[in-house]
Amino acid sequence: MPIPPPPPPPPGPPPPPTFNQANTEQPKLSRDEQRNRGALLQDICKGTKLKKVTNVNDRSAPVIEKPRGSSGGYGPGAAALQPKGGLFQGGVPKLRPVGAKDASEAPAGKPALQVPSSRAAAPRPPGSAASGRPHDDTDSNRASLPELPRMQRPSLPDLSRPNTASGTGMKHSSSAPPPPPPGRRANAPPTPLPLHSNKAQAYNREKPLPPTPGQRLHPGREGHPAPPPVKPPPSPVNIRTGPSGQSLAPPPPPYRQPPGVPNGPSSPTNESAPELPQRHNSLHRKTPGPVRGLAPPPPTSATPSLLSNRPPPPAREPPSRGAAPPPPPPMIRNGARDAPPPPPPYRMHGSEPPSRGKPPPPPSRTPAGPPPPPPPPLRNGHRDSITTVRSFLDDFESKYSFHPVEDFPAPEEYKHLQRVYPSKTNRAARGAPPLPPILR
């Protein structure tokens, strides 16, 4: 059988020579056709003479030059180019003089240009409103009209914002044009900054965001407005009013220290220094009532934690702890529902959480000093883990209804049977294995 297959390949090669012969024979037979083909190829290679059209260049030039060169002649043309990309080519350079001089170009009567001018004035009022809202009455009046076009075309203001920022920089000499938000913050500090800082801190505790640390950096640099932000924390919780009045001196350092070293690992060491006086204060306050001892640590720990790199976890935990300070177990349940494993390790990381977990169990351990804090959090962590497991089981059982054991049928009686496996039997009993089949 192996011998016959080779013969078919030899007959295969003959066909290719036939194709080669055919290819070679065709040009020999049709030399006239080759000449015609050569002539066609020459014509194709030469190509047709193209006329140099200058009108195309003239057409393209005025489309770009119309909005740029003619400031007042092509009012309708500019209006027609609004939805296209030409608006940004012509509108962007026109926004700069509009931001600098609104009264001079207002009588020109260009509805298409007035809308971007109003947009240029629009981003300022929200910044002033966020800082304190008593900034400019004229800007607030202008903001009412341009808000509608903004909603209709959200993409336009995004592209024109850098120019509008430069236009606003002309009016506000103290603000830096490239970053509008910090510029707006820099404008407000003289009068409305304390109000703005109070609102910012109350909002930061609820939802910490990246821009908010920037707002805190400004009051921290000025130094004077730092104490007023310390006062608003006691307002939300009545329990903090007493300790806050006495602990006004220690809190300012945590506000001023984090800006200097916010990201470094030495931040906990800096935070530990202000915590010590507060711990002493908490010890002195525990004599009248232990509830006050619970209250002071959360504010101190909440403020530096918000300034730390990981704002979300502290934001989730403080509200649950502040919601019901007296009963610790329910607060831990809330934490366990969100993420059971993280709470114990999170308490292990920082020095502040030990202060949180430290006061509740026994007041007698606290006077021992700074060395004992590590062991209590470990014990509290184990207790909390047990309580979280129990509470989780209770909640799990309460959600579902289980059948009693009596409802299920009785299991079948177990009968011991000796099972025989052929692989475990002796070869002698099985006999000799069969001979392998003979290959033919």
Swiss-Prot record:
- The modified positions for Asymmetric dimethylarginine read 37
- Report whether Cytoplasm shows up as a keyword of the record: yes
Region feature Disordered, mapped onto this chain: 1-38, 56-386, 419-440
Domain WH2 per the UniProt entry, residue ranges: 36-53
Note the PROSITE patterns from the entry. WH2 (PS51082)
Question: What broad class describes the main subcellular location of this protein?
Answer: cytoplasm
Q: Which InterPro entries match?
A: WH2_dom (IPR003124)
Source organism, top-level taxon: Eukaryota
Q: Name one GO molecular function term.
A: actin binding
- Enumerate the UniProt keywords alphabetically: Actin-binding, Cytoplasm, Cytoskeleton, Methylation
Q: Where is this region: Binds actin?
A: 49-52
> Where is this chain's protein located in or outside the cell?
Cytoplasm, Cytoskeleton
Q: What does this protein do?
A: Plays an active role in the formation of cell surface protrusions downstream of activated PDGFB receptors. Plays an important role in actin-microspike formation through cooperation with WASL. May cooperate with WASP and WASL to induce mobilization and reorganization of the actin filament system.
Q: How does it assemble?
A: Interacts with WASL and WASP, and this interaction results in cytoplasmic relocation of these two proteins along actin filaments. Interacts with NCK2 resulting in the localization to sites of focal adhesions.
Protein family: Belongs to the verprolin family.
Record's protein name: WAS/WASL-interacting protein family member 2
Which organism was this protein described from?
Mus musculus
- Native organism taxonomy: Eukaryota, Metazoa, Chordata, Craniata, Vertebrata
Q: Which gene encodes it?
A: Wipf2
